[in-house]
Every structure is written in structure tokens, then in C-alpha cells.
């Protein structure tokens, strides 16, 4: 509407507006691409062919959904094996049927062979030819997952007593996934609609009572889990998702609360000099600034000069957090967590309050002992092993089953894996999968003081060695984290060269770590925190897949260590992992990529309240991304370095719709099946 007058002026002069024709053509093509017409021919032995026609939305149709449609369309009922191919052209331009083996193949088919319609062929194979679509059994929406069946099921006491919110998610997810079946009724003239539109302002008010109090917090989260939130409403709703408000506040009380907390933030911001000595404060500020200047600069909110108000607000927010939370301080990656919050809140004080809310849950990710990250790695391995034993075995044989290339995913909860606007939706959906956890009184903006004594750590008075950050020199003895790195150093000097962490594609920070391992470390040199294993050179790159050195004790269970018992299969080199723990059995020493490994037996998964340290859906998002690329990885035989480079190239490029849809289906399958082993969770928690 804003350009209407300009357009009329141009048309009045007799000259068409520049680029209007191209824009109109692009818009028409985009509109046409919203629906792809599909014609399918089923061929089975000597039986006459059968035909079906329907329409799909290419943005929300994955290969899994297409398989489900075809099973229902031809009444295959999962009892027969079949292959899918589409009519395309080979390199010589000849028409030929090309196999559909992955989502990438399907995207290619949509892009190159869908005019005037996509021609598919389904070839029914005899049942003895191959096993029956094992992956489909894992990732497909189940017909029996409908809410009427779920409500009639006999639920375990664990689920009923401890997981009422999870049970609600299960029921609601069942209703949503069953809508996949409605695709069969789509006709050429109908619009393809998403499962749920984003939450609107009008609908949000239905979750509030007449005094403005949130009366249905669980239902609100379930609604957001299905469809996200309208961008204009995020500023309001995210404060609930990040557990900023105490329970029961009215609308007026919420406004007064945020004003008071903002004033508290401004007071804390003015106390930097009182809370940190000049040398440490300058180091914190320079470290934060280095990251801020490389965080989401392509987004309009953070574009512009380096001294712009939004970059300055992000810098001050993170510096204040580091100064007021000495046990956590600042680590690289925190700017990625704060950036979307500030962009949505558009208010420095409000963003700081929300950042404190999310860091209450995520601060452990940045702890120098690495235990939280170790647990998440172990749980992701458990999940992948359970969901796709063949793919897990492939990664074992490739020496990549440590999943260290997923480090960035787990540390930042996948924030960098999607385009900025998609990441906002992914984050709110993930947060909504967690039960409400409002503060009892109010969000604490100041963390506990450091418990580290002055003597023996070489830090300044009242300032712990942790607060000195990253590669900053510091004196004193070793810590749990340093002991773990010592163990890695010992293991990496064993037969066969470097340990599993020391990959050719390692970061410069890991190269420095490798150099330090060549001889006894200088006790005055502080080793980098796992989130800081990135050199200044790589700061302009995506947060690469830096492994947590503590996990070296998982990766080398048979390696000698000065603090570990004599090496046996049952012994735990970390000293705090249970003997015979399945987690220890999962993470072994480096494998010979050329040596075939025995099949991996199935195993249970921790219950939701333990899985992923209480955030199980995030693990299923990671699993969905892995499975999206499974076929490509296995077909091309990617090794560890190639895997890491493959996913680094996909930073901010993953397809959110496909990943969310697959993750929800996998998550619903996990919740319904109750393949839970509390001992697994207990052992993982103890190990972490």
C-alpha cells in the first residue's frame, strides 16, 4: 500500500515500474508452488495398474508424509514393501523414473518435475525382497495415536503422577498427527493449510480470566507447541514461556513487576565497577564485544554500525549477566541465546529479565565441569541408537558415534541451525514443550557469589578462576575439568595417534589444546572452557562443533589414567559413572572405520523428566535433523570430518517445517510407547 502512489506515477508516464513484471511472475510462481498436484500409478506384478490423484503442499510434505499418504491411498496398510519413483529427466534429457529415497530427492522432484503435475510410480515388491520399511515404523504418525485411543489406555502410575503435562502433550500431539490423514481428501481446488496457525492475540486472551491472570498455562503451552505464536504477540507470550512471571499476576501487576525488574537491572548495570575489578571487567567487556559484533549481524535488528543501540544493548545485557553471576560468568554462545530475546522484547531491561529466566535452565551448559553437556550427549546417543540402530552402527563404524559434530546443537538448543525468523518459532515451540515453572516470588537477577577460595587459584580477591574465562592466564591447581583434559591428553598419546577429539577438522582452539597435550601443561595456563574452544579467527564463523573435553573420559574407557583404577572393561575411568553403566557401553574407544561392528541391541530411554536434562523435545529435534540427512550421509559414506563439514554448511539452512513435523511425530511415538527405563536416566544423571 505504501508504494501505490509511486506505482501510479510510473504508470501515468507510460513506463512500467522497473521489475514489476519479474516480481509479478515470481509471486505467481510462488503462489503456484504452494500446491503441487500429484498423479500416482501403482504397479504390482501382473495386476492392472491403479491410479490416484491428490494435491500436497511441498512446504509441509516430507517423504515420510508422502509414504503415509500412499499407504492410505492404495490401502497398503504397511503390509507390503514398495518403492517410490518420480518421472524426471536424466542427463541426456530423456524421461526416466528416478527413485525417491530421501527428502532431498522429494524436494528435487517438487522443484523440477511437478509441472503440470508430479508423476509418481509405486512398485509393489514381494514381501521377501527386503525388510519392511523399518524407518517408516519409527518415524511415521501412528493411526492408533488418536486421542480417543489414548484416553482409553491404561497409563502407568509414573506418567499419571509425575508427568501430567507430558500426558497432555501426548493426547494433543495425537490429535495433530492424525490430521496428516486429511491430506488424502485434498483436491486440486482446495488450499493446503498448516496443522495449526500461530497463536493470535484474540485467542491468547481466551487463556486469561477477567482479571488478566493466566488461568490455563498448560493449555497455552500446548497450543503454542502446535502452531507457535504470531510475531506481534511474542513480546508478551515469551515472558510466560521463559518463566518470568510469578504465578497469579494480574495484568496491572505484570506491568508493575516488569517496571520494577527493569529498574533493578539498570541499578545492577551501574554497579559493574563495584562488582568487578577494572582488569577483569575490561576482559569481560572485550570478550563479550567480540562475540556481539558477530552475532546475527545479517538480521535487520542487528545490522548497521558497530556502535548501534541494539548491539550496545546486547553487549551491556551480557556484561551485566557475567558480572552478577560469577559462578557462570560469560562464555561464547551466550550471545546467541540472548540475541533472539532482545530482538523480540526490543527492551534491554525486559530482555535481561527473560535472559535470566532462560539461563536458570541453561546455565549448566556452560559450567566448566561439562557434566550437563555430557549428559545431553549421552542421551542423544541413546535416542539415536534406539530410533535407528542401522544409522547408529554406521556412525560407529565411521568413528562418529560420539556425535561431537552436534555440540553446537546441544549447547545453543539449535538456535543457529535455522534462519533467524525460523529459529524464533523453533525456540518458542521447544519452550512450550516444557512444563510451566514460574518463580515462587520473582526472577532472581543476581546469581550466588563464587564459592572458590582466593588461595590456590591465582584469581583476584573475590574473583574466581572461572570468571577469568577461556584462555585467560590463571594460576593454581587442577580442577575436575582439567583432570578430564589430562585424561584426554594421556589417551591421545596412545597407539594410533590422536584421540577422537583431535580431528583434522578441529578448531584452532582444539589445535591449541592438542599442542598443550604434547607435553605437560604449564600449570599457569588455564585450559579453555568447552564453549570457548573457538579461536578469535573462527568467531566470524558459526559456533563450530566443538567437543566438550570432559567427554574424552566417555570416548576412551580403556585408556589409562592416573586417577582411574586398573583398566578393565567394567572399570569407570571417570570415577563417578556406575560400573557396567549402559552409557559406558555406548561410548567406546576409537574404532577402525574399516572394521564391521556387531549390531546394536535395542535399549530403553530415560523418562521425559530426565531425558535431555528435562528437555526431551530438543533431543527429538536433533534426531529429526540427523534423520533428515541419514540417507545422504550413508549413501555417500561420509566420515567424521565430512559429517562435521556437511552440517556446518547447513547452518541457518535447515527446513523448519520438515524438522518440526518429524520431531513431533518421533516425540509422540516416544511418549505413547513409554519405552522408558528410569535406571537409564538415573545412570546418565549420575554420570553427568
From Swiss-Prot:
InterPro entries: Rab-GAP-TBC_dom (IPR000195), Rab-GAP_TBC_sf (IPR035969). Residues 544-567 have a biased composition (Low complexity). Residues 596-606 have a biased composition (Pro residues). The modification Phosphothreonine is found at residue 160. PANTHER family: TBC1 DOMAIN FAMILY MEMBER 25 (PTHR22957:SF333), TBC1 DOMAIN FAMILY MEMBER GTPASE-ACTIVATING PROTEIN (PTHR22957). This is TBC1 domain family member 25. It comes from the Eukaryota. One of its GO terms (cellular component) is autophagosome. It is found in: Cytoplasm; Cytoplasmic vesicle, Autophagosome. SMART domains: TBC. Interacts (via N-terminus) with MAP1LC3B, GABARAP and GABARAPL2. Acts as a GTPase-activating protein specific for RAB33B. Involved in the regulation of autophagosome maturation, the process in which autophagosomes fuse with endosomes and lysosomes. It holds the Pfam family RabGAP-TBC. Residues 228-434 form the Rab-GAP TBC domain. Coiled coil: none annotated. One of its GO terms (biological process) is regulation of autophagosome maturation. Keywords: Autophagy, Cytoplasm, Cytoplasmic vesicle, GTPase activation, Phosphoprotein. Residues 1-27, 544-606 are annotated as: Disordered. One of its GO terms (molecular function) is GTPase activator activity. The gene is TBC1D25. PROSITE patterns: TBC_RABGAP.
